[in-house]
Swiss-Prot record:
One of its GO terms (molecular function) is ferroxidase activity. This is Ferritin heavy chain B. The keyword Chaperone does not apply. Stores iron in a soluble, non-toxic, readily available form. Important for iron homeostasis. Has ferroxidase activity. Iron is taken up in the ferrous form and deposited as ferric hydroxides after oxidation. Pfam families: Ferritin (PF00210). Keywords: Cytoplasm, Iron, Iron storage, Metal-binding, Oxidoreductase. GO terms for cellular component: cytoplasm. It comes from Xenopus laevis.
Amino acid sequence: MQSQVRQNFNSDCEAAINRMVNLEMYASYVYLSMSYYFDRDDVALHHVAKFFKEQSHEEREHAEKFLKYQNKRGGRVVLQDIKKPERDEWSNTLEAMQAALQLEKTVNQALLDLHKLASDKVDPQLCDFLESEYLEEQVKAMKELGDYITNLKRLGVPQNGMGEYLFDKHTLGESS
């Protein structure tokens, strides 16, 4: 059955939004896996675990925002299987933060591709939604991760386990 509220909403944009939902849920899943790795008793970096858990919640909220938008525009939600994270273990916080930055860049590129598609299909509402809800936040997230990576390297991680502890306690512990 066709939606009665659908207007100027291209089916390519609708399909791309469903793919974005899947990517955001995958990102949430990766961050959740990271969180519980750093919460293990033999890793015990609780502020790092908390940071990644918050990232997981944020990514899930992004997916839900896309789901709500899809319905608002008269599109149809088509959920897909969420891929398992490629790893379950991390050598250190630096390695995990670098992987998180790469993940955020992947999400950012997908958002930019969706914005281009919306622009090509002359969908100013979708462009506005992406600009107001996602694009600036992605830039901030990438900057934050970049700063964390710089500070972890400055503290001598991965060679210096004390640096990892200090980062957990003082950098992430301060934001708690």
